[in-house]
From Swiss-Prot:
Reactions mediated catalytically: a 2'-deoxyribonucleoside 5'-diphosphate + ATP = a 2'-deoxyribonucleoside 5'-triphosphate + ADP; a ribonucleoside 5'-diphosphate + ATP = a ribonucleoside 5'-triphosphate + ADP
Binding residues for ATP: 11, 59, 87, 93, 104, 114
One Pfam short name: NDK
Family: Belongs to the NDK family.
Domain of life: Bacteria
Role noted for this protein: Major role in the synthesis of nucleoside triphosphates other than ATP. The ATP gamma phosphate is transferred to the NDP beta phosphate via a ping-pong mechanism, using a phosphorylated active-site intermediate.
Subunit structure: Homotetramer.
Listed GO CC annotations: cytoplasm
NCBIfam families documented for this protein: PRK00668.1
Native species: Frankia alni (strain DSM 45986 / CECT 9034 / ACN14a)
Gene name, Swiss-Prot/TrEMBL: ndk
Lineage, uppermost ranks: Bacteria, Bacillati, Actinomycetota, Actinomycetes, Frankiales
Name by which UniProt lists this protein: Nucleoside diphosphate kinase
Length: 137
């Protein structure tokens, strides 16, 4: 089976709580390989582009404000069915509905500060990787 890539963001709440190692460890134990990793604070324009699909929604401003509020870790993981595999590890967007054992189920409480982002499709992954790591693809 061919390798697929996905973008994972450990959001500012995950970084400030010291959970980067937990996220990376779970991805690696699942069998995914890290091909890029960077600690950075996002520029607002990058955040607005990343969350562009939500621009007309009432929570857009809060979402952007949060993601630029502190450093995050952006990483690219690779492996068979990487998008699907990482989404399973991450859990449902609403942490209260996320399964125990998932990152959000174990470590997050609020939908707005839900620890981690993962690409939701191979097409989104390509777009997001191009935004965060231009030249990697």
């Amino acid at each position: 089976m061919s390798a697929e890539r996905t973008l994972i963001l450990v959001k500012p709440d995950g970084v400030s709580r010291g959970l980067v190692g937990e996220v990376v460890g779970r991805l690696e134990r699942k069998g995914l390989t890290l091909v890029a990793l960077e600690l950075r604070t996002l520029e607002r324009s990058v955040a607005e582009t990343h969350y562009g699909e939500h621009a007309s929604k009432p929570f857009f401003g809060e979402l952007v404000d949060f993601i630029v509020s502190g450093p995050l870790v952006a990483l690219v993981a690779e492996g068979p069915r990487a998008v699907e595999a990482s989404r399973g590890l991450i859990g449902a967007t609403d942490p209260v509905k996320a399964a125990p054992g998932s990152l959000r189920g174990d470590y997050a409480l609020e939908i707005g500060q839900n620890l981690v982002h993962g690409s939701d499709s191979p097409e989104s992954a390509k777009r997001e990787i191009d935004l965060f790591f231009p030249g990697l693809s």
